[in-house]
Structures are given as C-alpha cells and as structure tokens.
Amino acid sequence: MLVTRRWESHPANSPDLILQFFGNEFHGYGDDMPETLRRLTELLGYEKEEDGAGMNAAKKIAAELNRRKDDIPAFRRLRCLELDQLNEFLFSTKLNPPIGDQVHHDMHAPLSHYFIHTSLNSYFTGNVFGKYSILPIIEALEQGVRVVELDLWPDGRGSICVRPSWNFEKPLKLQECLDSIKEHAFTKCTYPLIITFKDGLKPELQSKATQMIQQTFNHMVYHHDPHSLEVFPSPQQLRNKILISRRPPKELLYANDDDGKVGVRNGVEIRQHPADPNYQSLVSFHVVEPRGMLQNVLTGKANKIQRPGWYETDIISFTQKRFLRTRPQRKLLIYAPYKPQRAWMHGAQLIALSRKEEKEKLWLMQGMFRANGGCGYVKKPDFLLNAGPSGVFYPTVNPVVVKILKVKIYMGDGWIVDFKKRIGRLSKPDLYVRISIAGVPHDENIMKTTVKNNEWTPTWGEEFTFPLTYPDLALISFEVYDYEVSTADAFCGQTCLPVSELIEGIRAVPLYDERGKACSSTMLLTRFKWS
C-alpha cells in the first residue's frame, strides 16, 4: 500500500524552526547552509511530530552526531561542529550508513546453520560464451564470496585445466587458479573458504590434482570425513581454513527425479571413473543437490506451492544438520529464471548464482550477504534451526504480520557525478525510485515514487509501508530510473539490503551499478522506522 504524505503546516514545526535549531547546535548561518541540508530542513519542517520526524528527527540527528563526533577522525579535533560537518555526516554513506559493517552474528554455531555466499562458474568473465580468467575469482573473493567453483578436465598434455565441459575459449591452468585463490582467499574475511571441484579426471590426474592442492595450501586444507554424522565445526573454528568439496558421488543421498523423495540412486553414474583415495581424502564437505520437483520448488520454477510435503517441511529439518546446494537449471547453454529467496526460506545454505547473468537475482544475492559485515556467512533465523510449537517452520502457512516497516524517501544526490554520461544529455533527468521487498511470498511487494522532472537532486518526501510476516528473510531493494516516454527507462543505480539489519532513523543509502560496484557519489537519503 502506497502512503504519500502531503506537506502540511504544523504549529510546532516549520523549516525556519528546524533551521534555527541546527544553527544553534552547529555553528553557521542560514545563508551558508548547504543546499542539500536546506532541502532536508524543508521536508522535516512540514512533518508531524507523531510521524517521528520534524523537530524530533532534527534532535536525534544532532544527538547522534555529537555522540559519534570522537569516532570520526575528520571531526575529532574540531572544537565545535559547523553546518558543513552536519551536512557531510548526514549525506555520507560511510558515516551514516543504513546497515552496520561489523560481524555481529554468533559465529560459533555449526557451519550448517549459516547461509554461505556462493558463486557459480566462478572463472567466467561473462556468459557461457565469454572468456575464462582468474580475475572474476579474485573479484568474487574480495567481495566476500566463500564458495568458488572450478571445473577440472584433462588438457590433453598430461596435465589439468579449468574449463566447462563444453569449451569455447582458452582454458585456464589449475595451478594459476589455486595460486590466486590462496593469495586472495582471506583478504575480505578469515572465515572458511570452500572450493568446489567438478571434475572429469581419471585417477592418475586426480592424484596430480591432489599434489597440487596439498603443495599450494598445505596445512590450510581442513580434513574431515564427509560422511561423518558428527556436527560440522563452526566458522569460528574453521577460520583461515580451506574446505574441499566435490560434486556428489552416486552413493550420496539426493532427491529422486520422479517423486521428490530422498533416496539412493545407484543407477545413475555421476562420475565416470573411480576416485583416487588421496584425492577423495581431501574432500571434507559434501553437499546434496536437489533434483526434479524439489529443485523446481527451491528455484522458483513451480507456479505455486502445494500443501506441505517432504519438500516444504522435511527439507528444513534436513538443512539444520546437512548442506543443500541449489543452482539455476540450464536449458542448452542458458540458465533458467531463478529465485534465490525460495531456497533461503527452506534453509538451503549454498545458493549458487552466476555473477554475470540475471542481474536482478545478483542484486538479491549481494543484498543478502551485505548482512553480518559482508563476511560471507549469515546465520539463519532461529525458526529455520529449531522446531516450533507447531512443528517445523513452513513459510506459507498461516502468515501473521509481526512488524511493519515504514520507508520514507526524502531525496537523492550524486547522479550528476556518476551518471552524467548516461542520462540528462539533452535535459535534466526525470528520476523515480522503485522500492521492493523480496522474501516469503506474503511479504513480497513493489512500490514506486512519483517521477521528479528535470532534477539532478530530486526531492520526494514520500513514505511507503511494508507489512512483514518474516522480516528476518526479507530483503529491500531500491532501484532508480530516469523516466523515458518512448524508450525503456534508463538505469540510474540500485541497492539491496537485509531488512533485519536496517538501522532506524534517517540514513544515507549508497547505490551501486548493475554489477554491484559502488557508485562514488550517488545516494538516497531515507528514513527507516519500525512499528
């Protein structure tokens, strides 16, 4: 439901009163006030106190800045703060971010209790027809990815190369991939890195791969019986460790294609050659991959979820102790549409997604793993880890709204710096914001602001209300577009954030480009409020 507040004068508030308050708290004169701060005071001046804005919001802003002054190096030595510092604080995505940047989840639980940032086709520079390189692997590791995937094949000269089963480009050498992984594995964080090998190697080449892995990583490789029923160690216990995973051998349990039940399929050969014992001993991390109806449900291919069955309830019990990996289904060489939130709400830990395709799904993946300081491990909500009074959590039965999130878009800035070459060539842009919630089906929603014509620094002052049944699984996305009459609207930045980590109050929300690279200046000044 879209709620747009009209600007109404209110006896207790006015832009002049708030401007005067800021002038008393921070040195400076109204004539010297930065334009962006002046626009905000105008918006606050016409808001009612019961909305949590107006003078109340101004006082909270002043109190927070004064409280944090000594923590900001640029402000620490200043005797008194001026309006310029207030403006810098409010509109800085680093000083006034929407979510925290520190690891704060409990990292001592078993590894199966976490969603893990997973990549698909980690060495692809583009789609399946693109070139292969170590640079995408390095980029992924520097952005907090904790699972990388390598396809191992004979190179025809007695050694091992990295390429898909089909090969359109020059393959990579396994050793250069291993060296790059070792160098960058723990630059973003020190929690364990999982390397998944999909191989078509004969035993003699598996033995050679074992030697290369051991010589490269040495004591960093964690050894654990993948078939052990013991609880897997925690991320904290596995810091600076490398875990080796392999596509499941035929003896491993996985979902049957026909009826979606868990069973043992001995009739299908997943590997063509027996594994070298030393190579197999490196594998410490086995993952189940769903098939058939279960895969359709977890990847969002099913049109609707039917009554609770194994694939909706028992799968959540299964993922409390064991690992489940999902990936988009491929038709020929193109991946089918994919909904990662469907897999998350069933407890699947490893949701593999190509970083070069399906940009909207990539944004969701990046948003999920901005949680917990961006370390690549996000602890599952308690309702996915423990059976409640009515049994195992089932996400589409009897939803009850537990929280209401109110989001107010005040204004935005920075497009003239980051997007001037793409928009506004003939006139100033006509910008609007698309706000959406991704999560369990009952929580998903899409809303839009009005279009602000001919503005590089648009001011909206519009509020939106989102009732949420499972906020711990919800992601909020902001997408900005330049409205066009006769052509597709031009992309002007996006971000996705975990709802559970939003900091209440007026925050500077940073925007990113289509591949998730941070824009240098573009941001949205937004207020988050829970009720």
Curated annotation (Swiss-Prot):
Protein EC: 3.1.4.11
Biological processes per GO annotation: intracellular signal transduction; lipid catabolic process
Tissue-specificity statement: Expressed in leaves, roots, flowers and siliques.
GO molecular function terms listed in the Swiss-Prot or TrEMBL record: phosphatidylinositol-4,5-bisphosphate phospholipase C activity
Annotated ranges, domain PI-PLC Y-box: 267-385
InterPro entries: C2_dom, C2_domain_sf, PI-PLC_fam, PLC-like_Pdiesterase_TIM-brl, PLipase_C_PInositol-sp_X_dom, PLipase_C_Pinositol-sp_Y
Record has Lipid metabolism as a keyword: yes
Residues in C2 domain copies: 389-513
The keyword Hydrolase is assigned to this record: yes
Annotated localization: Cell membrane
Reactions it catalyzes: a 1,2-diacyl-sn-glycero-3-phospho-(1D-myo-inositol-4,5-bisphosphate) + H2O = 1D-myo-inositol 1,4,5-trisphosphate + a 1,2-diacyl-sn-glycerol + H(+)
GO cellular component: plasma membrane
CDD domains: C2_PLC_like, PI-PLCc_plant
Membrane protein topology class: Peripheral membrane protein
Necessary cofactors: Ca(2+)
Coiled coil (UniProt feature): none
Keywords, alphabetical: Cell membrane, Hydrolase, Lipid degradation, Lipid metabolism, Membrane, Transducer
PI-PLC X-box domain residues: 105-247
Known role: The production of the second messenger molecules diacylglycerol (DAG) and inositol 1,4,5-trisphosphate (IP3) is mediated by activated phosphatidylinositol-specific phospholipase C enzymes.
The protein's name in its UniProt record: Phosphoinositide phospholipase C 8
Protein's organism: Arabidopsis thaliana (Mouse-ear cress)
Gene, per the UniProt record: PLC8
